[in-house]
């Protein structure tokens, strides 16, 4: 039987998880899975249905009619919500807040769990999120908890949003990020925290290449791949 590797990268919003995980997946020829996009897609469905993200009953009622698919175009993950590519629509601050709210609903996490795990059964994967090493893939071959200061993380997110043409100030992004940090850490269902055996990597003040270099060194040391 062929050995399949699973690498879990967790951390708060804006820590660079997706960018770093995507780069490492490309280098290693692994599949990259962005689980945060799944929560954002469910949050988007709730927003479109005019259901509050923290309305557990209302959001849960939407789940039976939600169909999510992942496709890969030139190595980039795209997420489809009931057949519609919503990869761009889910990258707003509103979608981020909704994602944090719906991710605190146990029924939503249960709804997504097997879908998330299914990708690691037959593939080498790098999966990022907030509870990959603690809940989704507790048996992952390597668990990394990636973090940075809230100011660093907000600056990265702000620049990303400016590149997408979004009209938002740094102060607005920082405030939204600090609210999300509080929500993610305080929720009862799978709160944001490092797995006991996770390697902690702080990228405060690092360039993207420096951060990728640190993660690459950890993977090489631990897995020799």
What name fits each language-model region?
Residues 17:
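Conserved lysine of the Walker
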Residues 71, 116-123, 132-135, 139, ...:
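Small-molecule kinase domains that catalyze NTP-dependent phosphoryl transfer to phosphate-bearing small molecules
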Residues 12:
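P-loop (Walker A) phosphate-binding loop of NTP-binding proteins
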Residues 20:
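Hydrophobic positions on the alpha1 helix immediately C-terminal to the Walker A/P-loop
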Residues 87-164:
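ATP-dependent NMP and nucleoside kinases share a basic, alpha-helical "lid"
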Residues 26-91:
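N-terminal phosphate/diphosphate-binding loop that engages ATP/GTP or pyrophosphate donors
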Residues 9:
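Hydrophobic anchor at the beta1->P-loop junction of P-loop NTPases
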Residues 1-6:
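Extreme N-terminal, non-catalytic leader segments
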């Amino acid at each position: 039987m062929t050995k399949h590797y699973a690498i879990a990268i967790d951390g708060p919003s804006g820590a660079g998880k997706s960018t770093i995980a995507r780069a490492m997946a490309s280098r290693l020829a692994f599949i990259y899975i962005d689980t945060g996009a799944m929560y954002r897609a469910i949050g988007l469905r709730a927003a479109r249905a005019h259901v509050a993200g923290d309305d557990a009953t209302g959001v849960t009622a939407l789940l039976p009619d939600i169909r999510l698919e992942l496709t890969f175009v030139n190595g980039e993950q795209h997420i489809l919500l009931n057949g519609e590519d919503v990869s761009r629509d889910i990258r707003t601050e509103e979608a981020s807040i909704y994602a944090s709210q719906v991710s605190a609903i146990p029924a939503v996490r249960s709804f997504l769990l097997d879908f998330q795990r299914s990708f690691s059964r037959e593939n080498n994967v790098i999966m990022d999120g907030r509870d990959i090493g603690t809940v989704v893939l507790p048996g992952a071959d390597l668990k990394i908890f990636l973090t940075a200061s809230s100011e660093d993380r907000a600056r990265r997110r702000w620049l990303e949003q400016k590149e997408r043409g979004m009209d938002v100030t740094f102060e607005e992004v920082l405030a939204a990020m600090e609210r999300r940090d509080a929500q993610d850490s305080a929720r009862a269902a799978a709160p944001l925290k490092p797995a006991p055996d996770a390697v902690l990597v702080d990228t405060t003040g690092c360039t993207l290449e420096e951060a990728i270099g640190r993660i690459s060194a950890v993977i090489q040391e631990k897995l020799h791949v």
